[in-house]
């Protein structure tokens, strides 16, 4: 029995090793190589964050404006409120990492266009923070709503928060018969 399993698994493993580079090259050839970047840690975090933010943008675009006030139950945020929340927290976390006061934002946007514009502004603000952030500064002290931590923690929380709420958005889309954009990248 062991030999039969080995006869199947060894060739499959060999093929996997040979094809893995080809498969990974097809995931997203446009991603920067963090190993070659001047700030590989910040670049790695930024790749994940950018991917999540792209997915959130696509979810915001995919949901019809008539469904922006949709909420699966009365005690959770609406689709629009999640997007507002993501924008506000992106501004808050990225400004904290940069050591600035968060830019003024408004909540309770009245249209899909305004909500998407604010979301785009928040993501662009974070882009500027990540692009100018050296790895050497990642262990600098930071405040996470009263918790003493470092800048690395703050920057990872931007991507973590986006991923958390992207999961909410996918559920809202599917409950409304809208297919989210697929894939890892």
Feature locations, PLM:
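Bacterial N-terminal signal peptides
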Residues: 9-21
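Well-ordered alpha-helical scaffold segments within catalytic/enzyme domains
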Residues: 55, 59-60, 94, 125-130
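Carbohydrate-interacting regions of secretory-pathway proteins
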Residues: 32, 50-54, 108, 112, ...
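Acidic/histidine-rich alpha-helical segments that form the ligand environment
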Residues: 110-143, 149-164
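Cleaved targeting-peptide boundary
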Residues: 25-34
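Short, contiguous alpha-helical
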Residues: 27, 46-57, 67-105, 143-185
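N-terminal beta-strand motif that seeds the catalytic metal site of vicinal oxygen chelate
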Residues: 37-48
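N-terminal secretory signal peptides that target proteins for export/translocation
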Residues: 1-7
